[in-house]
Amino acid sequence: MNTNFDIASQGSSGLALQQNRVLRNTYMLLAISMVPTVLGAMVGIQMQFSFMAGSPLMSFLLFLGIAWGFMYGIEKNKDSGLGVALLLGITFFMGLMLSRILQVALGFSNGGGMIAMAAGGTGAVFFTMATIATVSKRDFSGMGKFLFIGMIVILLAALANIFFQIPALSLAISAAAVMVFSAYILYDISRIVQGGETNYVSATLSVYLSIYNVFVSLLQLIMALTGERD
């Protein structure tokens, strides 16, 4: 009986160590991924990537195509160094795309403050969701289907609003995106804590994309509500 208990304890301890290692490596790679994101944003601002705004639909489809291509490559190579390299590549690309909304924000007299506010809000969301997932030890995997449906609805609404250009719909999409992707951070980190995600490259990609979308959506809301022209 004692032998069985010892084996079970060792197995449980080993699983906990693996989960902690995946979580630690995810946070480390997530922090590193912010470097190419910032570099990409700086390059995009310098290169005036706003020219892509001339064709919103084509830009949207091009963005999705390149992003999904990166994500496919990362998942196929997540157990090798190439997966890490592709992950850093997509974060640089996302930084380039981020430069468009940053240029718009910097066009306001309080642009720097709005960007800082969005960054601070995103950080607060991340730390709150990460703490809940880690401390509560609850299994939030049941949220997955609902969050996926929510993400698809947001994607379709964003695509439709490219044609309709309804300001109120744009605000609603941004608000919904903040809620859905904040919940995705909770869901993704919970999967690591519960042992549902054992690859830190895949985990980093999921959490990074959620953080990115929370930041962009928060910035859009802040610009719409507090933006000041000279």
Residue ranges, per PLM feature:
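A hydrophobic alpha-helical transmembrane-helix feature that marks the membrane cores
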Residues: 1-230
